[in-house]
Amino acid sequence: MVKVNGNYLKLKAGYLFPEIGRRVKAFSAANPEAALIRLGIGDVTEPLPLACREAMKTAIDAMGTAEGFHGYGPEQGYAWLREAIAQQDFQSRGCEINADEIFVSDGSKCDSSNILDILGEGNRVAVTDPVYPVYVDSNVMAGRTGDAGAEGRYAGLTYLPISADNNFSAEIPSEPVDLIYLCFPNNPTGAVATRAQLKAWVDYARSHNALILFDAAYEAFIQDPEIPHSIFEIEGARECAIEFRSFSKNAGFTGTRCAFTVVPKGLKGTAANGELVELWGLWNRRQSTKFNGVSYIIQRGAEAVYSTAGQAEVKTLVSFYMENASIIRQELTSLGLQIYGGEHAPYVWIKTPNGMDSWGFFDHLLNKANVVGTPGSGFGAAGEGYFRLSAFNSRKNVNEAMARIKSL
């Protein structure tokens, strides 16, 4: 009989968001009249920017002509999009990133998992706790961990606790590690890292020959001009980092799918025989074999993000969601709750009241206020006693959700 990948059997009961969906579905079946407001999963709600829609319509029309038709595109992405990304997202900030170091994909979630394809077994992996679950689960699936313990932590991973005590920014590990997952602005806590903090990580990685996997999916929400948007704003990062970016949250591409990963040329790892190997070549080979590229139509839409009109519309979208975050912060603070995040990220991180556990607070809000959020314990053991609310919803729904919670 065919054998299964036993690593999947080590995964905890369910990925966080499907478990939320299961509970919400059961509640809705029992309470069909309830008008739920969803502030849980980080899915956007506002329409795509007009500039992107128009660009995609033009691309669709072109596909209907012999001269404008596009079949398989470059697995790495079309040159015109890669050049726009390199110039406007990186070179404009002083980062030495070239277009051929940009790999366009259908999602940073996919890329942050698939990057393990080019990294060998035996690497010591460090993740924050709490953490975006994909970083942990993808390592479990790839056989890079042992079993989960009583608290849900997996053997073989180095957990770096983050809390209010360290401003939700992990301390440099005391033990040597090889792979370091960093996410700033942080999901789920909404914390950001200063230039000095990122420099400390780059210095550590360079001195220990480690690799930083830097998730910058929420960089567009940073409000302080002193806070770096990219790890490559830090000197030396080209020698030790890969960065993941997405159009999902800033431009509303969650349903159209477009993202990119930055792999600098000259970034190297070690083969089993001790030989130094360039990671750019491995990732290029991996993408050429396992990925057929993002749709021409979608890439034209992504390119429009960098137009003058597109930039203005994206800025308006980001401002809208950040105003939602501000409303959530203000209203919950007025209730005496301890609130974090929501200033440079679309997530508000809440200390649950009265010693309530995370899932208990989830059920409380679901049943009493018909509001759906995300239990902090779903992001790791150190997230127990916290709760995440997302600013991704309409202004009407955010205001209504706050009114319901305040009435409890």
From Swiss-Prot:
Cofactor(s) listed: pyridoxal 5'-phosphate
Matches recorded under CDD domains: AAT_like
EC code: 2.6.1.83
Residues noted as binding pyridoxal 5'-phosphate in the record, renumbered to the chain: Y72, S108, K109, Y132, N187, Y218, S246, F247, S248, R257, N292
Positions where N6-(pyridoxal phosphate)lysine occurs in the chain: K249
Transferase keyword on record: yes
Catalytic reactions of this protein: (2S,6S)-2,6-diaminopimelate + 2-oxoglutarate = (S)-2,3,4,5-tetrahydrodipicolinate + L-glutamate + H2O + H(+)
Biological process annotations from GO: lysine biosynthetic process via diaminopimelate, diaminopimelate-aminotransferase pathway
Residues engaged in binding substrate: Y15, G42, K109, Y132, N187, N292, R388
Family assignment from sequence similarity: Belongs to the class-I pyridoxal-phosphate-dependent aminotransferase family. LL-diaminopimelate aminotransferase subfamily.
Quaternary organization: Homodimer.
Function, in words: Involved in the synthesis of meso-diaminopimelate (m-DAP or DL-DAP), required for both lysine and peptidoglycan biosynthesis. Catalyzes the direct conversion of tetrahydrodipicolinate to LL-diaminopimelate.
Protein name as it appears in the record: LL-diaminopimelate aminotransferase
UniProt lineage: Bacteria, Bacillati, Cyanobacteriota, Cyanophyceae, Synechococcales
